[in-house]
A protein has these predicted regions:
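Generic structural signal for beta-strand residues in well-ordered domains
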Residues: 17, 52-54, 81
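General N-terminal targeting signals
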Residues: 25-26, 46-48, 78
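A contiguous, basic/glycine-rich beta-loop/short-helix subdomain that forms a polymer-engagement track
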Residues: 31-54
Length: 168
């Protein structure tokens, strides 16, 4: 609800997914913890440390604490785990990932940003695809037409493994 120069969000209706912060172009709506600035500062530190040690840009994988963590754990037990240059970042909900975090991760030094999302969360995923398209359009001129950002929507660890093997 717009109230003068502020935006009021009814906490009784809030699902806690972070969609409001992901799609808000002004930053007026944001989740309380972790805030966008906290996440971006964290990503900057991780990326700069990785680059200093490995002498190459890392890739980033956002995932949620329930769905994503379980698939990644399974991948580690059954397959070879995640690629060595792919840094997993667990967040409460992948609905929180918007153009701010995607482009911010690129500015922080990540060469690609992937989002592992749950196929059963249609509303979150629809918004995520819109945000990925926006972010790819924003960086299109510097990417030579290559997409920096991609969602992987699956419950299948084998499909995730196959997608990760395609990374350059």
């Amino acid at each position: 609800q717009i109230n003068g120069d502020t935006v009021d969000i009814n906490t009784a209706v809030c699902g806690g997914c972070g969609l409001c912060g992901a799609v808000c172009p002004s930053g007026a709506a944001d989740v309380i913890w972790p805030s966008s600035s906290h996440l971006l500062n964290r990503l900057q530190k991780i990326s700069s440390n990785y680059l200093r040690i490995e002498n190459q840009m890392p890739k980033l994988l956002f995932h949620d604490s329930a769905h994503g963590a379980g698939i990644i754990s399974y991948l580690s037990r059954i397959y070879d785990g995640l690629p060595h240059d792919l840094i997993p970042i667990e967040i409460h909900s992948t609905g929180r990932v918007g153009h701010d975090l995607l482009v911010g991760a690129t500015a922080a030094g990540f060469s690609n940003v992937l989002v592992l999302c749950n196929p059963q969360k249609n509303i979150e995923n629809e918004t995520l695809y819109d945000q990925i398209n926006l972010a790819n359009a924003m960086v299109g001129e510097i990417s030579n037409g290559k997409a920096f950002y991609k969602a992987i929507e699956t419950n299948d660890p084998e499909k995730l493994n196959d997608e990760l093997l395609k990374l350059e």
